[in-house]
Amino acid sequence: MTVLHSVDFFPSGKAPVAIEPRLPQAAFPEHHHDFHEIVIVEHCTGIHVFNGQPYTISGGTVCFVRDHDRHLYEHTDNLCLTNVLWRSPDAFQFLAGLEQLLPQEQDGYYPSHWRVNQSALQQVRQLVGLMERAGDGMDAPAVANREILFMQLLVLLRRSSLMEGATNNDAKLNQLMAWLEDHFAEEVCWEAVAEQFSLSLRTLHRQLKQHTGLTPQRYLNRLRLIKARHLLRHSDHSVTEIAYRCGFGDSNHFSTLFRREFNWSPRDIRQGRDAIIQ
């Protein structure tokens, strides 16, 4: 597995934070690093496999990667990211207690992926721009200024995440997408889902297309197919059983959609024939 080292990314041995734009982010094999990373998805979509679990990411997704996590990107579609790298909680001179603003693992579950609305994403871009222009001076005021900007970023992400329970249409769509991540295998009636999240059906279609470039049904199908591919690689369930487990009522239809999405059949994935290009 590829290991990325801080010496190759941080401007100096003492700098606690670095900015790495990926515009766009190409598919990248599984790797980990000796630093922490906040991945901010600017726009378009891709698959983020985080510690072996696949997530569909799109504009507004924020992922918190720790120094022992492993991850990769695949099936990227002009996916644009900004990576905010930081060494460790004890690398800062003026900041303490950062853990209170970061996702925390509880009972083996780590809530690594958050979503923020487009207004917050614009504020994030502005803050990151200030961080990029803050210079690399090592005198106390310069260091303190950079660390304050990083703290402001964490506060903004925390306040803007789903945990804060915002109620505008943008936030409702984020909540809907998080719901789909957990309920993808269920039969989905879009009229009922729109009503559940207090959105009109037209608004749901328009906003999801703006966020992901996909219609609601296409987004749901992709989510199901990603989960199915994970099961094909990491379980002993039959192709038919996996199709049903992931919300497809017909295994032949599932196989057709799967090949169209990934250019491999479910059986190819089960037999590892795609491994040569991973």
Curated annotation (Swiss-Prot):
InterPro entries: AraC-bd, AraC_XylS_family_regulators, Homeodomain-like_sf, HTH-like, HTH_AraC, HTH_AraC-typ_CS, RhaR_RhaS-like_N, RmlC-like_jellyroll. The keyword Transcription regulation applies. It is found in: Cytoplasm. The record marks E241, D250 as: Interaction with sigma-70. Residues 174-272 form the HTH araC/xylS-type domain. GO terms for biological process: positive regulation of DNA-templated transcription; rhamnose metabolic process. SMART domains: HTH_ARAC (SM00342). Keywords: Activator, Cytoplasm, DNA-binding, Repeat, Rhamnose metabolism, Transcription, Transcription regulation. GO terms for molecular function: DNA-binding transcription factor activity; sequence-specific DNA binding. It comes from the Bacteria. Signal peptide: none annotated. Pfam families: AraC_binding, HTH_18. One of its GO terms (cellular component) is cytoplasm. Residues 191-212, 239-262 bind DNA. Its main location: cytoplasm. Binds DNA as a dimer. Activates expression of the rhaBAD and rhaT operons. This is HTH-type transcriptional activator RhaS. It comes from Salmonella dublin (strain CT_02021853). The gene is rhaS.
